[in-house]
Structure formats: structure tokens, C-alpha cells
Amino acid sequence: MATAGHKGAPKTKVRRKEKKNVVAGQAHIKSTFNNTIIAITDPSGAVISWASAGTVGFKGSRKSTPFAAQMAAEAAGRRAMEHGMKRVDVFVKGPGSGRETAIRSLGAVGLEIGPISDVTPVPHNGCRPPKRRRV
């Protein structure tokens, strides 16, 4: 009876992230009541770096804090600067508490902040909003 030979793990190529040389781009900040997500893109919209309050180590209700948004923006900004990013136009979406802090911390990381636009979608009286909380 022949013994089955151990086949070892299939060899996979490790793709190293290539350094994109993008000087100017866009920072899209989506700030909800539960989380803040920052995506930094090149002018055509291809994502260069991103971070959220969850990816930088916050869980549960701490993700919705301004401090979590600050840490996420710093992480995304640092990663974008590694690809040569120097200037960003900011697009803010959503009603969350991390909007202003995220913009401020993108500037603190060393990115030059261009025009800031609020692109929060406003319904023409669409869906019924969630009921009011009674505490």
C-alpha cells in the first residue's frame, strides 16, 4: 500500500503594492451615526487608501465617536501620502459626529485641504425616517 505524499500548500505569488504617484486627489468621508469611513481616491475616483473607525481598532459604540473618526482619517491620510498624495478635495457625506474631526486630522497629517463639499443625499420626501428614541 502506497503512502499518500504530503502535497504542501500551493505556491501563491505575493503581489507587492506598487507605489502610485498621485499628487492631488479626493477624500471621501462618509460619516454615519455608527461609523466613519474615509476613502482617498485619485481624481478619476480609483481608491488609493481607505480606513474606517473599525479598521483602526474601535468596536461597537466607540466607532461613532469623533476620536475614532480622527484616527481613521490619520491612518488613511498617512497611507495616501506614502503614494505621493499632497493635496485633497474633501467630500463629506452623512450626519455623523466625525465629520469635522476627520477633515481637521487630514490637515494635521500634512495633506493640503482643498475645497470642502457636503454631498449628503437629501430625499425629496422618500422613505419614512426611523421613529424617535424615547429614553
Curated annotation (Swiss-Prot):
Annotated InterPro entries: Ribosomal_uS11, Ribosomal_uS11_bac-type, Ribosomal_uS11_CS, Ribosomal_uS11_sf
Keywords attached to this entry: Ribonucleoprotein, Ribosomal protein, RNA-binding, rRNA-binding
PROSITE patterns recorded: RIBOSOMAL_S11
One example GO MF annotation: rRNA binding
Function (record text): Located on the platform of the 30S subunit, it bridges several disparate RNA helices of the 16S rRNA. Forms part of the Shine-Dalgarno cleft in the 70S ribosome.
Subunit-level organization: Part of the 30S ribosomal subunit. Interacts with proteins S7 and S18. Binds to IF-3.
Protein name per Swiss-Prot or TrEMBL: Small ribosomal subunit protein uS11
Organism name: Cutibacterium acnes (strain DSM 16379 / KPA171202) (Propionibacterium acnes)
This protein's encoding gene: rpsK
